[in-house]
Amino acid sequence: MTRIMYWFSFLCMILSLFVLSTAKPCQAKEISVELVWKLGQAGWVEIQVTKGDYQLIIDATSRKLPAGSRLQLGWAGWAPIVQINHEEFRVLKESKLEIKGINSGNLSVKTPEDTATVYRGDLALSWQNSHWQVVNKVDSEDYLKGVVPIEMSNEWAIGGGAEALKAQAVAARTFLVRHTGNGEKAITDSPDIDQAYAGVLVEGEASVAVAATRDEILVDDQSKQPIEALYSSHSGGYTEDAKNVWGNSDINNVSHPDPYSEEVGGAANHWRFIVSAPVLGSTFGLGPVSKVELDKYPSGRVKSVRIEDGFGLSKTVTARTFVKKFYPFGQPIQKFAFLGSFFETRKIATSPDLFSKSGLPAFLGFQEKEQGPLLSKISSTARGPSSVSQPFGVFIFDGRGWGHGVGMSQWGAYHMSQLGYNYKEILSFYYNSTFLSKP
């Protein structure tokens, strides 16, 4: 009996070693984030240790950088240069350096033109193509603390949106895992490329959501792999099929009605853009436009726009191209901005009987003033009034939603949270054929 138990124990040990050796590896905790949002073309960078102690590795040497230490990195015209604290500037023998944390700390990074952004973790810098490439090496969960509050808002936790923040944390983590693998690939901090990441200074209530969902990601029912967890600000009341935006079919991101995104989101819920027929035409190399025709997807989003001028010349462009011509890049979002491809259009003639007493068309929704521009003098709501009247009319674009509309609508998630849905129910509504998993 003793011999049998011995062999049984030995067999169990061998089996356990086999299971451990063949288990799926967990995702790496440290990730690399290339800081391109504000530092993409930085020729001069200032770094300061704001908390903790760091080690500077430079030109095959190392030195300690206690809290308060400061570095300036630039270009001398023939080689990169560095200044450490108040020492003299010196030429770098190697065009790269690392700043590694000895203990838990923070680093402030800025260019002469921008305010400072503070990051956890380490920094690796290298001079490439006439600018400094700056990479933040940081724990993945700390990274998410700098993503969720800027992709959504810390204030949503107070307004009943705590579950929406959890849903955002899971979506952002899933996006991270899918795009970095086990940490071998870098991700950027840019919302135009990957996800918005703004470091320590934006951290707040959203960190609770990150902690509450730690390591949770969305995986596909069939493949068991992380999904493409796409999201945008506001779906306009109908999510879009991934194929119609990115060109590839995706069973996890399909088009469906989204009642939770209706009547929420301020300017994103309903926006209006006005442009004169001459300005619209000149934008696309045509004369004053007489007709605009829209080709749409089943969701109602515009697929392409056909523009025809008064001379019979026409041009057809994709909705994305059309929107980019008028999108308010770098400007505050407002209700008189062109925010997406979910829109209708109509033409209004510049007829005097359409004017309000103040001179501003009352039906356009503008705030009344004692003196206002005539409809014929409106060039566009982006440019404002013109000093010269034109008789060709204006086009009004009434739209809803903000962003591509694929996957989770952030405003819709917020509304669902306010209505009592939990983050798992929110994710289930927006992402098809998925389940939550911890790698």
Placement of each model-derived feature along the sequence:
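Conserved, single-site charged/polar hotspot
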Residues: 2-439
